[in-house]
Structures are given as structure tokens and as C-alpha cells.
Amino acid sequence: MTSGRSTRVTMFESQASMGEPSNEDLSSTDDVRTDAPLAYAKYVTFDQSLPLERGGELPEIRCCYETWGTLNDDGSNAVLVCHAVSGDSHAARHDEDDQPGWWDGLIGPGLPIDTDRLFVVCPNVLGGCRGSTGPGDADPTSPDGKPYGANFPRITIGDIVEAQKLLADHLGIRQWRAVVGGSLGGHQVLQWINRYPDAAKTCVAIATSPRLNSQALGFDVIARNAIQTDPHYAGGQYYDKDQRPDTGLAIARMLGHITYLSVEAMEAKFDPDRHDPRQIASQFEQRFSIGSYLAHQGQKFTTRFDANSYVTLSMAMDLFDLGGTRLKLMETFDEATCDFLLISFSSDWLFPPAQSREIVNALTALDKRVTYAEITTNAGHDAFLIAKDIATYGPLIRERLRDTETHPAVPSDITLNVDEESILEIIPAGSSVLDLGCGNGQLLAAIRDRHRTPGPPTTEHRLMGVEVAQENLLATAMRGIDVIDYDLNHGLPAFIDDQFDYVILNATLQAVENVVELLNEMLRVGRHAIISFPNFAYRQLRDHYVTHGRSPKAPGEFDFDWHNTPNRRFPTIADVRDLLGQLNVVIDEEVFWDVDQGQRIEPDNDPNLNADTAVIAFHRENR
């Protein structure tokens, strides 16, 4: 029988079948960034001082930003896009003649962030060097008008958000339709929700974390040391010097580039010509192809970025800390009113998926609307900027930003099988339901559609799925149902006690590694549990084994050879009943089917022999 819990695969072919990735597949949009003038940049200066989180203030600030699309009359279609450390306001092309943007695959007409109907705003961050106030600007308190340099105040992600809040007020935006960002941009959108819980309808945080882990902190410390010990750093006042700390900044960037890639990406990119590097004019080692590449990237970076800005922004990222425990993160997001979409990447070791799951676990415990996907990729942290991976996760963003009035969720076109119909009949209307191994979400959609109420689901009527196959995650999300990417073999730590009325395990029991642990978890999280499973004591299977002396096999539900079956376990109705008795649960209802014959089997007709499928609802008394 096919398991409801699918093996993790991408929406593309598996790595084994498609061969090694091409260098083009691994090309980040960072490669197209330059120091060219920002032709579509807009500027606004705020005369009032900006108090800073760690003390002091900036007497005035200038914000450089770009916009796409048209703001509607009530300002409800505005999307804030937040960039990473080395990004800028130029997130996307404005027309065919424009320079490439760093998120061209995501922002534009007809794209997931659709500028035909959304008004997109992307500001250069405070502390940056592409138009907004930063260390390279004149210090108004300096008697000779020198740049701030290293005297630029120590700012935080919170200060960056406050500057963006001034811009939002200036543009007349009271609430963002969404705040979207990756890496450091993800930190910004999370801080937006922390500081202003009702500031956005949707929060999209990509390849990010609630705080940096110690390894990531260590890389940033080394990068700042490389810059600040460069003999040309001059205490940060190098702007009027003939030479700048380009060596230190280049080394910092080289180090950063390594953290943005993965082992697989680096092997694919550099092993084919490991000992045949492309020679470039550089003082840096070029014995290997990776050395030539890093030298090129490091030197190129010095032409468009300021060393003091790198120090300032990397420190702001390192100081960012929404909490290192689930309880602290729950406190951080307790008042949030938005829905959340979190996306991580399997090979990202700078902001590993486990850190996104920390946020997801806190949001789930708070009963916030959240969808989470871990995208399988070999591109590392840079995946959020790579076209192939944008094509994978972009549809999730498109769904989250869908106009529910003009573009309702994908029509359900639901065709339930008999065990799903039986589950549907058991669950009372208005129940909150968690579906483990939810597949394409059709059972949850049927539960929702049966007694649909206008507006978003309430806590009482909460519907949520757990799934690992990315095509199923997308299909479930396209139905407008929250779903999180999670391996059931790890239990259900994201959920709190009695969080749902019903927890469903549909056609998945036979694929679970630790059956007893998962059943106990279902009874902890749900007040009631429902399981459906294939009965391996079914008459045809017995006959096949006894008559032919071969591993049991039958048409339809059991049509697998012994060597390719997805099943780990081979439960029978009698065995499952015995196990439930050992777990001291009360069986509420049982439904048995001979699906092959299209017949319902009554309890007194020996279902252990005559049924190929069982549905059992149960609960635990004296919890």
C-alpha cells in the first residue's frame, strides 16, 4: 500500500537521476551585482533623530529605496522586501533595459511577488553603502564634516526596522500585505513582527534564523578581524586615503562565499578543473580553481561595497537574538496577528533548517498560521538567490500572497477513497484536525469544505497538515491549508498537549519507524486519534503466501514486490487492536473495507480475514 508519508524529493529530478549540477544551476544572483548607479532609486530624508537600541541616536537619516507596481487607494497591497548583508534596493529589473536585480525570479509581472497587483518596496538598509545613511556619510557632529567611518553608531536589526517604519509611514502604508526577506532580510522581517505584531498580514522568512549559532558568529568575527587589521583600515577613516582596506574586505568576502555554498556545490563547481584555475590579476593564491574563484569574488566585492558597512551590518546580524529557547520564541511571537511562511534549504549550513524549525515549533505551539518547507538542494545558503531553487519555493510565496477575493484557493476537485470517506464521517463538524502525512491535502480540504465558514480558520477549527514531499507541500498549500515539512519519525515536538480535537494518521502507519512513540504522541497532541492502515492478514494475501510460497502480494493496495515496498511494518487488524489495548486506549469506532470488492465489512464478519483496509478511532481516558 502506498504510504501517505512520502520520501523527501524535490520537484525536480533527484540528484542521482539528473547527474551533477551545472555551474549555471549554482550561479547566485550575487554574480550580477555591480556598483552601477541605481537608475530607479528614490530618496527620502527624515529630519527627526532616530534613537538607537543600544544607545545614542542618528540626528537624521536618509533612506534609498526602489518600488515596483502601484500602491492601491487604501495601501493594502504593499509588500516590503528586505535584502541580505551585501544586497541593495535593486531587487528586480524595472524594465528590459534595466540592470538585473538580485531577486529577478521572484519579483515582477506575473511572478510570485506579482507587481501587476502588488506594490513592492525594497529599501537599502540603514548602515549600508548604496544610498541609505551609513558609515561613509558625513558625520553631522564632526567639525570638519568627516565621514562617520568606524564612529558610525552600533546599530541593530531593530534600528534597521525602525528606519523602514519611517519609510512605511512616509509612503502611507499602515499595514504591509507581506514582509519578505532572506538571510539578514529574514532577520528584518522577523523583527518587524516582533516589534509591530500587526504590521503585516503575512511574514515570509527565508533561509534565516532566530539568532546566529556560534559557528556563524565565528565566521563573522574572523571577517571583521580581517578588515580591521588591514593596514589600510586607518581606524575606519580611509575615505580620503589613496588605499582602502581592500585586502581585508576581500578576505572577509571570500570567507563569506564559502559559508554561502555547500560541500556538494563546491565539489560540482570546482572539482572538474581543480588543478586548472583561471588566472586573474590578483595578489591572492590561485593554485586551485577555488582559489581563483574566491580571489575574483573578493576583489569584485571591494569595487561595490564599503568595509565599514560590512563591519556595521555583520555586527547588527550577530547582535540579533529573538531567543534561544522555545519559550523565549513563543514570547517573541505571542502577539503576532499575521500568518507565516518559513522556507529553509537542506544544504544550508550557515542558517541550517533546524533553526527555521525552532521558529516553526514556537509558532505552532502558539497556534499561529504557519507553513514551512525545507527545500532539498545542493546549493547551500545561496539557494534563496538561485533561479532553480526560486522556481521550487516561489509557488509557496505566490500562494501566500494570493488575493483570496479575486483568486480563491485552487478548487478542491476532491476524490476521496473509502477510508478517507470513513474518516470524514467520524470527525464532527467544527473540529480542529492535524493530518500526519497529509499527502496533497485533499482530506483536510474535504473537512474544511464540508462546513466552510468565511474568513481564516479559528483556533477552534484549526486544520493543519504534516508532510515531507515537496510536491505535496505545495499541493496542500495551494488548497489554502497550512502545512509543515516534518519527519514523523521524530515524533511531534512542534505541538503542545491537547492542541487538536483529532489527529489523523491516514495510510501511513505501515511506513512509520517507531509506531508506539507516534501513537502516544498522537494521543498527547489530540484529544482523539484516527488511524487507517492496510490489513496484511487480508484473505488474498494469506492465499498468496500459503499457495505460492511467495511474499504476500495482491492487486491494488498491496501491489508491491518484497524489494520495493514502501512499508516498514505489516500490521493486521488483530495486531493493531492488541497494541491499542496495551496502550490503554478506548476504541470509539471501527470501519472495515474490502476495497478490492468495494464492500464494507461488518465487525461480526471477521474483518481480520475479509477486510483489506481498517479505520480505527480511539482516545485515552484519564489523561
Swiss-Prot record:
Catalysed reactions listed for this entry: L-homoserine + acetyl-CoA = O-acetyl-L-homoserine + CoA
One GO location term (cellular component): cytoplasm
Binding locations of substrate: R253, D382
Entry-linked CDD domains: AdoMet_MTases
Domain AB hydrolase-1, first and last residues per copy: 77-385
Annotated active site: S183, D348, H381
Biased composition range(s): Polar residues: 1-17
Keywords recorded for this protein, A-Z: Acyltransferase, Amino-acid biosynthesis, Cytoplasm, Methionine biosynthesis, Transferase
A molecular function (GO) term: homoserine O-acetyltransferase activity
Pfam families (alphabetical): Abhydrolase_1, MetW
Gene3D superfamilies: 1.10.1740.110, alpha/beta hydrolase, Vaccinia Virus protein VP39
Membrane-spanning intervals of the chain: none
One GO biological process term: methionine biosynthetic process
Entry-linked InterPro entries: AB_hydrolase_1 (IPR000073), AB_hydrolase_fold (IPR029058), HAT_MetX-like (IPR008220), Methionine_synth_MetW (IPR010743), SAM-dependent_MTases_sf (IPR029063)
Major subcellular site: cytoplasm
Function: Transfers an acetyl group from acetyl-CoA to L-homoserine, forming acetyl-L-homoserine.
Quaternary structure note: Homodimer.
Protein's recorded name: Bifunctional methionine biosynthesis protein MetXA/MetW
